[in-house]
Amino acid sequence: MKKWIIILTILMLPFTAHCAEPADSVLEVRYIINEATASFWSDAEIQAWLDQGISDITSRALCFQTSDTITLSTSVYEYSTTTGSVSVSAIVKVLGAFYVSPDNEYIGLKRIYANQIADLPYMAAGPPKYYYHYANKIGILPLPTSTESTNLVRIYFARQASGATLALRIADLPTEYKPLLYLFAASMAWKKEHRFAEANATYATYLQQLNALKQELHNVPPEVKTP
């Protein structure tokens, strides 16, 4: 009987309204674990699991996507912050980049990995051709000269939620992922109570739905093949 209650609860989650955070998300989790007010599980515990879930979802699903620029500087090839002051340490994955030339030409950069750098051909300093993401830095090669200095490279990336409070981090999460956030927190709550069957089943459902949503939204093959 309990298993059917869990399944019905999961199916109802996407249709629930959200207003005041993080209180609403705590109530959503309490609805799943069947504890309307704090008794065995405190609100602080549930909020901590929600925060952990946001990090897990944004890292696995690459769902918090945005773009920014890097301002090139003469003879500098690695950058730790963007023009908009985003720390590269908060970036989960760089999805693409292009260089904006002084003539407003847009030149796509090829992604490489750090272990490929030794295989690159000799390159004189000049306009960028390659980029890599390694050790909380974004590298851009070849080295820019004074001609390229202050020009921009625009990068598209998935990052961790950036809000200063839990309410803002929940707001950073795309709406379609929020029901999965409640499943994650509920699985952690049941684990605390040593209800490992419910915890494992809920976490497995969380992972299954997360992977399915990621495939549907972000792993779609491009409609136009690049040359």
Feature names for model-found ranges:
Residues 13-19:
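Sec/Tat signal peptide C-region and signal peptidase I cleavage site
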Residues 19-227:
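Glycine-enriched, solvent-exposed interface loops adjoining structured elements
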Residues 4-13:
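Sec-dependent N-terminal signal peptides
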